[in-house]
């Protein structure tokens, strides 16, 4: 399978104070999120001048992708400019016939995979009958470069805190019911498996997995433990240093720079705990190499590059033109709002 372009497909984020509320309304449309909740989340963005880091990171990643794949690289978002519909129309007008779609999510499940599939289908409808063929690349939570980037980030973070720091992986929480529908437990098992691979690569036999950034009614159970509660448990157990690795995020979303770098760090300081946050891949050149590798798998028909290990978990394979991915285990809708 040959390609004449690449589409980097992401979540989107505001780039000025006046964009914050419209962006959040896009993210939460149809979910019945009360206005006061939007106001609270908007304040998180205002701490950064109303600018999410995600679009700048993705533009830098586009530059790295162009250098790696040697093809035109386009950039489109679900929830803010550049909208994926506009990007795909531009691809059509430029004569693109088939593009590989690299989504900024390593996971399966509705939020991690199916929403991006829906984005592709919606964008192709907007572009009409001459829309390019769009092939979404497979999930990559167990790709060797994914594991390597996070393992190296943990090593760098460990150098900034006392020896013996406790390693804690985090990922975005989702409702327990949603996690059960998609597998069952597909997303949480993928995260746990990826954490085990990264921990082993970083030289850790013992570590923790916690969840972050939950929302919704308190009576609805979400994946636990919450990272803030887990940090309190570590404090009570006498832990004095922690390395937090946000393995669920391939870039610095607002959940990383606010929920971890601001709120969790403040909690750690109050508790007398030294906290280091491991970097996300962002625009690391290896992330672009990872994407190139996924494209080469489709070109050559070769075996996928995966880090093997006990308790391995299946992921989504490539999907074409917004058709459901294979295996078909991402159809159930989750309700977890993600940030950017």
UniProtKB/Swiss-Prot annotation:
Primary residence: cytoplasm
Q: Which UniProt keywords apply?
A: Cytoplasm, Heme biosynthesis, Iron, Lyase, Metal-binding, Porphyrin biosynthesis
Instruction: Show the Pfam families listed in the entry.
Output: Ferrochelatase (PF00762)
Q: Where in the cell is it found?
A: Cytoplasm
The record lists the catalysed reaction(s) as:
Fe-coproporphyrin III + 2 H(+) = coproporphyrin III + Fe(2+)
Q: Where does Fe(2+) bind?
A: 172, 255
EC code? 4.99.1.9
List ligand-binding residues for Fe-coproporphyrin III.
52, 116
> Tell me, which GO biological process terms does this entry list?
heme biosynthetic process
Does the record carry Transcription regulation as a key word? no
Q: Name one GO cellular component term.
A: cytoplasm
- Cited SUPFAM superfamilies: Chelatase
What CDD domains does the record tag this protein with?
A: Ferrochelatase_C, Ferrochelatase_N
- Listed GO molecular functions? ferrochelatase activity; metal ion binding
The pathway is: Porphyrin-containing compound metabolism; protoheme biosynthesis
PANTHER family for this protein: FERROCHELATASE, FERROCHELATASE, MITOCHONDRIAL
Q: Family per UniProt? A: Belongs to the ferrochelatase family.
Q: What functional role does this protein have?
A: Involved in coproporphyrin-dependent heme b biosynthesis. Catalyzes the insertion of ferrous iron into coproporphyrin III to form Fe-coproporphyrin III.
Q: What is this protein called?
A: Coproporphyrin III ferrochelatase
